[in-house]
Amino acid sequence: MPMVTAATSLRQALANPEAFIVAPGVYDGFSARIALGAGFNALYMTGAGTAASVHGHADLGICTLNDMRANAEMISNLSPTTPVIADADTGYGGPIMVARTTEQYSRSGVAAFHIEDQVQTKRCGHLGGKILVDQDTYVTRIRAAVQARQRISSDIVVIARTDALQVRGYEESIARLRAARDAGADVGFLEGITSKEMARQVVQDLAGWPLLLNMVEHGATPDITAQEAKEMGFRIIIFPFAAIGPAYKAMQEAMEKLKRDGIPGLSEEMTPQMLFRVCGLDESMKVDAEAGGAAFEGGVELQK
């Protein structure tokens, strides 16, 4: 029996009104492995985290389609049955590029992606000063993604994101999302929700359509827990800074300690073997043994 793809699995979950998807933000293979090890059933590949980890730059439209697709593919293939929702920015161009983005993400194993209505020189949705394309251009992007998905008979989930709230206000944001829904988008995403009351209102105003909540702590949106989002009626919640925020703090403290004391001072359990086990060491050793290899017959523990 063929394996159900991650995209199909996510689509089936969205068709089940009782299902609720919590996706922590990950930005590289290590953060993805840690999230999977914690038991999450979906992941979110953050564009901000990708820009920071791949390029060392802020989320200002630095990443190309190739950057994002390669990172999304690597993360998706760590656990091919686990849905990965990936940032796809503006689709990286006009309708032809949006279609190409859709096709490449789908063939890379990505389960879902979101496309927004900022200009190509975009910025993080929780920064001020955003500039939007007109609604017709936005809808063209969504339509191009939906039609590309249909052409290749893919189940990849198309998420329509609008950044209009901070620029044009709530009513135009809802109008844009309705237009995206009419163009075939599977899920709606209002970026930068500013209150819990607004969160409840958008669910009411777009009733019957699955909605995603973006929970960026200390950004434009007040703290909303996964349980609260579920009770409000959202179907997906993502936490883009769930990994990169704590990683920054931990690495900063370790570097300061190394600079000050001449050694990072890692805890005793932080051995190479432990870190490699997070990254599939035991599974790789099993593959070698089952194929008749002898590379790991003696194990990998140091003899002291």
Regions found by a protein language model. Give the residues of each.
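Alpha/beta enzyme core
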Residues: 2-239, 245-249, 253-256, 290-304
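Flexible C-terminal active-site loop/helix
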Residues: 258-304
